[in-house]
């Protein structure tokens, strides 16, 4: 007989493995009681085998009538509290609390093992679950009779996939359409899986077509899917690993949960705000489960003194991963001794405190486990009160610990760092390490002993483990927390311990691809001279100043604001994006521009009688029309209400200046309008505000007035897959810096030692100033060029030394003394302003003509590869003073206008004809069809040059602009290439 490749056979493989290898019982559909929505016989068997005294005291099974009363109340408890809560906390009936599950035992407790073995894991095929329908669910898993999981299986060989299983859940397993199907109702079953032979998706709450299925795949090659399994189908890990008894118990005890969050929402009828409880049913995704388990295993095996870097994409559920890790780290034991005394979560998100506390309290009745510390006293109190998890803000943490000092050196800590790239600047991490290690040098008499204590304290401490989470690791973060990987050439790369890449998150549909619809606009300006004379200015600085001048002009902002408002209404709101709920963000380069944009957008919204309004967001206050204003003054409501109000009408457009560009989680955000330079981490973090998913969100949109697509592509590529540090930082760069500084003879070796002796012995401040002031006076005698080089090198040393001290064993007492000396000296050195050779420029010019024109509309493609980054750079102090390049204003403006002014409207006909001309070029068509995009682009640009030269007789003006202006040429080439290449790629 040929091999059975049916869906039924896949079902057989799964069920038989659980039965024969994982110790499950195999049940039948008749075991399931449709009236109560559970396996009443197994519930009864479990209780009778473990809690006979409670059964006797309550007479719950004394008669069919009593039994019915018991199961009626039991079923009601499942509906109200949820299956995971009933399993964890038991079920109260009359005078007794019935345990419904016995947790995983420790190795030291044989009695607990006996109880655990009484748990009944059961798998059932073809469960007929409804009183009204004859439908059956392919696979059903229960624990002690309680529903844990359902599965719909599909099979590629019979032409169906996981998508068909999802469709079946959405259309045929709608709980509202069949109220008698209790297993489909909210909270009654922990999770529902759609499974085929390649992929797994999961859903914790069925809502018909609104059901949200998340991936439960391992990932392959940094992307979606599952790797090839040598012994079976790709998804066999589900029944061979995840559904093993110990594994499933672990998930139910430590991960699965129902969380509740109170939120104020506006009543649409009354207009008043009302409190609403948002309920979330959570089951871990595979990467979260795998990450936390690997970290726990490494901690259990390696003890303290380790460091781990977790590179998880934005929007990948880091908050839950951190919560699950923190909760379980405090429970790890070495024999009977806790491996870690306290876990400290360092974050820049205040709301993480509430989230972790709520999540942990959903696991067990532990009201005193978590606390928040915002001062040294609250930290002391938390430690003395036995708090096991303490949350604090990144900037307060080192100073809090510094106050505790040597009291901590005998404690073992787990330090979980949320968004590690932003929390490990040199001085903060150094203070953290010194405090945790207890090496504060307070009781040492000799300077050398003090310095040795401080140097030792700067290193990554041995009485703590570091768990650093970030989506965008910088070189410093990779070296501090990454896993060292020596290479054959002698270099030492550093890699993440665990990763969930941006590529995988996008491919799995968990976050949106924010580069899919990326439109660039170019601003073309013509600036004229308004004075009779022809004054001279620094040519290079003048070009920057003129650009800033025209960008901040009211007419420039007005034209861009008009594009924003028109696009948001016609292309976003009118098209019903996110079910008509779409929001937008406008990213500006300064507070003044943000305020200008806000008022222009508000005026344009009123002009078109739009029902919607804008909000402006910035920190502090700014002078506007002669008075100081804050965001609250302009918006008319407190700053704390901005996030909440952006989720409620009439507010739809958020205008920001260095605010809400990180950490802002609003799934309704659909469009972003960028009028600010973005690069590297800032580009990824800012644009990633759009990537949060929503059941009705199908796409996102970016309109960029400032950045070209190549720059954005490079920024995202760095973090698309694994980010690898190419080599470790070189401590010898510190010697290069000190060599440069000491050329200027602003201090002596004796002065450095004298100051350190006094400083570390805590003398009166007056004894330090005379020493430092000598160096200041010598510095003032240097020429301006030497001052710039010297001060730059001092700052470079101060940036680099704390980092090197933390990650290498090569630090010296001389470096530590110089660090102290420079730290005090740099604050007293005079500011080096330099002469402004553009002073008065703005009074001599005016904006004559302005055009803001769409240049390209494309998807920015990222390459399927890891990215190596170089070690942390350090300034060399070799810059010195730059001599101004003086030029006449007329020449400066001619150069500026050559670069920035093209009369697009005058050559629009020629520009519009280019796509058809390029599509008719056979050399380009062949390259587009038969080679990669990069090769096709090179040929496209070559073909464009030939096409334009042939157009010389048609329009000399267009050809002159194209051939003479490289910026214009590149913009036209990019625009036309993307348009035509996209058509050819799609076979159009």
Please identify what each model-predicted range represents.
Residues 425-514:
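Post-DEXD/H (motif II) to motif III coupling segment of the RecA-like Helicase ATP-binding lobe
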Residues 2-342, 351, 355-366, 395, ...:
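ATP-dependent helicase/translocase motor core
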Residues 547-656:
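Conserved C-terminal RecA-like helicase domain
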Residues 387-419, 423-434, 442-456, 635-643, ...:
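Conserved RecA-like ASCE ATPase "motif II neighborhood" in helicase/translocase motors
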Residues 229-232, 476-581, 598, 602:
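Interdomain helical connector at the RecA1-RecA2 junction of SF1/SF2 helicase-like NTPases
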Residues 44-69, 270-274, 306, 332-334, ...:
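Catalytic cores and motor modules of nucleic-acid processing enzymes
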Residues 361-402:
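Inter-Walker segment of RecA-like/P-loop motor cores
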